[in-house]
Amino acid sequence: SARHRREPQWVDSKKVTHLDFSNDQLVGVSASLIPFLEHDDATRALMGANMLRQSCPLISPSPAKVFTGMESAAAMSSGYILRAKGPGKIKSVSPQDADGGSQITIEYDKAQVLDETGKESKQHVLSLRRYARSNQSTVIDQKPVVRAGQRVKKHEILTDGPGIKNGELALGQNLTVALMSLDGYNFEDSIVVSERIAKLGLLDSVQIEKFECVARRTRLGEEIITADIPNEDDSLLANLTKDGIVRVGTEVGQGQLLVGKLTPKPEKERTPEEKLIWKIMNQKGSDMRNTSLRMPTGEHGVVIRVDTLSKEDSGVELRPGVLQKVDVYVAIKRRLTVGDKLAGRHGNKGVVSTILPEEDMPYLSDGTPVDVILNPLGVPSRMNIGQLMELHLGWASKHSGKRAKVPVFNGCSMETIQDELERNGLRRDGKSIVYDGRTGARLENDVVVGVMSIMKLNHLAEAKVHARSIG
């Protein structure tokens, strides 16, 4: 089979003039990250490729045990990884500065870069992007992986980025997965998760939420941003600067002030007594309403950045009627909760239905409890058999201590995986004897247990909670 004018057809081998040099050429970057892609139905492979883009960068990700080899190429092309231009020594790694960045200074053995004057120089200063907010509210963080005084070789990796570990794409965690049902808790793609994952923070991520406060010119007068707010609790005002804006580094919880703001009251809102006192005492404070920006209900985080824009600033264009605009960026830790969406790389997605205590999870003969329980009915009709092959090879990989490379359209056969399982003292069918964690009784049938890379997608339950007081 060959392609002629983009159409596949059967031709004589002597007429073939060109040859694809890589199996990855057939698919895009996302699809080339799916191991055993050739064993997945096309619709599920498409879902898997799309969901790779929706994954949350985890606080401590781990590279997949079963990988395709394209992970490092994708990470290198992301633009977040910085590499040494030549052999040299790290002079310093500066902490995060006021602008939210940090720097790595390298002293190369030979002149490798040009300085500000255009002369060749041995010293190279690299600026890093730390704790920036992406359009999906996730964290963009170029983490230094070198330290001061360390020797580096040419092309050695100096930084990791979001979803990158040791210069390789790491979008999830390698978890022990069992394919079995558990009292209906994994009915219709629901997922049962062990409390161990929540306790260790294996699937924890950080969201950076942006809260905006605008002072406008109204009919009744100008709104003012100030720390001098009447009838407000002193403990809430303590975190504000003299300008009325929360300090960077402050830990804020629900209802706490981010920006203090007063808005002029309409005439009809004042009682006759207030009007009289206002006339006699000429009190402006009582003529203002407290419209401060507060932390929303149920949220808790740390203020990492504050941006202030004013009409007086040169080169700043604000909307008509806006006098001042304050943006407060708060880093919020998102722990794994019921309702979060998890997915593998084969379009096998689901929602966490319950987080069971570690001791209640099914366990193996050696006492190891499983981390995740998936429904076996999610495999036959979806025809994404790649997840089963990943489970088995991941299980063999865990016991051998080696990672398994499975390039797209060039992966190993089921017989090879079975041989690898046998070589590591495991059953050829990939099944294990499993005991019920609640009763200690052995399950009637043996269960497929393996290791799969599981991602947390950017559809978090905490961000989707809505409430209505009426209607």
Describe the residue ranges of each PLM region:
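A short beta-strand motif that forms part of the nucleic acid-binding face
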Residues: 108-112, 183, 195, 264, ...
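Long, charge-dense accessory insertions within large macromolecular proteins
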Residues: 1-147, 153-336, 340, 417, ...
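Conserved actuator
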Residues: 268, 344-351
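Flexible glycine/proline-rich, aromatic-decorated loop/lid segments
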Residues: 119-132, 352-371
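Structural and coupling elements of P-loop NTPases
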Residues: 169, 184, 197-202, 346-349, ...
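Conserved nucleotide-binding/hydrolysis micro-motifs of P-loop NTPases
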Residues: 183-185, 310, 335, 348-349, ...
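Long C-terminal interaction/binding lobes of large macromolecular proteins
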Residues: 282, 389-471
